[in-house]
Amino acid sequence: MKSNTHPKYEAVVFNDLASGVKFLTKSTVSSKKTIEWEDGNTYPVIDVEISSESHPFYTGKQRIMDSAGRVERFNARFKGFGGKK
């Protein structure tokens, strides 16, 4: 087998920005930002906007996300696109 063909698989902390929940798991994703975990070890931390802790499908609750306005920006940008000349 070839060496150095697979990405590094290591423990990382995912930080859910919407709910503030952090969880430790393993992933090939890496980050220069680190955090000290409950066990005293330091791990890379990945910030995510939505995880199973904050997604309405998993929580059963409707939440308002602060990414509102994307549709309005899209419509404003392409308002005249495809119109008759």
Curated annotation (Swiss-Prot):
<comment type="subunit">
    <text>Part of the 50S ribosomal subunit.</text>
</comment>
<comment type="similarity">
    <text>Belongs to the bacterial ribosomal protein bL31 family. Type B subfamily.</text>
</comment>
<dbReference type="GO" id="GO:1990904">
    <property type="term" value="C:ribonucleoprotein complex"/>
</dbReference>
<dbReference type="InterPro" id="IPR042105">
    <property type="entry name" value="Ribosomal_bL31_sf"/>
</dbReference>
<dbReference type="GO" id="GO:0003735">
    <property type="term" value="F:structural constituent of ribosome"/>
</dbReference>
<dbReference type="InterPro" id="IPR027493">
    <property type="entry name" value="Ribosomal_bL31_B"/>
</dbReference>
<dbReference type="GO" id="GO:0005840">
    <property type="term" value="C:ribosome"/>
</dbReference>
<protein>
    <recommendedName>
        <fullName>Large ribosomal subunit protein bL31B</fullName>
    </recommendedName>
</protein>
<dbReference type="GO" id="GO:0006412">
    <property type="term" value="P:translation"/>
</dbReference>
<dbReference type="Pfam" id="PF01197">
    <property type="entry name" value="Ribosomal_L31"/>
</dbReference>
<keyword id="KW-0687">Ribonucleoprotein</keyword>
<dbReference type="InterPro" id="IPR034704">
    <property type="entry name" value="Ribosomal_bL28/bL31-like_sf"/>
</dbReference>
<keyword id="KW-0689">Ribosomal protein</keyword>
<dbReference type="InterPro" id="IPR002150">
    <property type="entry name" value="Ribosomal_bL31"/>
</dbReference>
